[in-house]
């Protein structure tokens, strides 16, 4: 079998734009859906380029153990020295905000004050360290699902001891200071091939469930900075002195494609709070820019595949030397 691009994922809807871009450039590809497909680890994996697009929110789509299954696949591929985009180290960050924040701290990147709580008692005890509003957040999650806002410990107590309490799928809940953003936007910085592609501004006035993928953004709402009503807008001439730190962080963790989110507080400082290795792009925002996320990913994957195809097809010419020069 000829070499192909293998896309490892669990959400068909998010793959549609990538399929379209790969077809446009005639790139051979195959999908491994971790909610349906079975992988035989007794076999030697095929040759090619493997792109891991596993999502921390897979459990919300009925694929509870897809990340764990993907880790097994990535371990198998790595054991056979296959080329992987976003390897097993990257997946560990995708499914654990605790791991993300450890890496942010290592690279001296500011993030909100956060406690990682294993049970309800821990949540209530650590809330004593906040004298301002705070939020809860799942350690393994995505799109802001499960995030709740609290003004004080009494409100938290009613929540954790009530019927509406939502434990994280991995049993770890973050208790985090609420940063009042100024302006009311978040910024998502996109990287492909560990290089900056662009930054997108997201209107955050409506809450926490933010997802740049088109299926998540069908109902266009007014964004004060964007006259067409789309909540997502690519920032022209974006500049941020944290870019080099972001790049160092993702490179050291096997991440080549990512979206990193931060907000600016009223104190003027940037607070980074999420690293997404399963990144999506908003086509409406991209219409106003020459930069295209999925198009760039497709080209990157195809270039990587072609490099490996060229290397494997290369052979040294049949050269003969006088016996005197052979040692």
Task: Give names to the regions the model predicted.
Residues 134, 174, 197-198, 258, ...:
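Protein kinase-like catalytic core scaffold
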Residues 1-6:
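Extreme N-terminal starter segment of soluble prokaryotic enzymes
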Residues 237, 251-255, 264-327:
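C-terminal active-site "lid" helix and adjoining low-complexity regulatory extension at the edge
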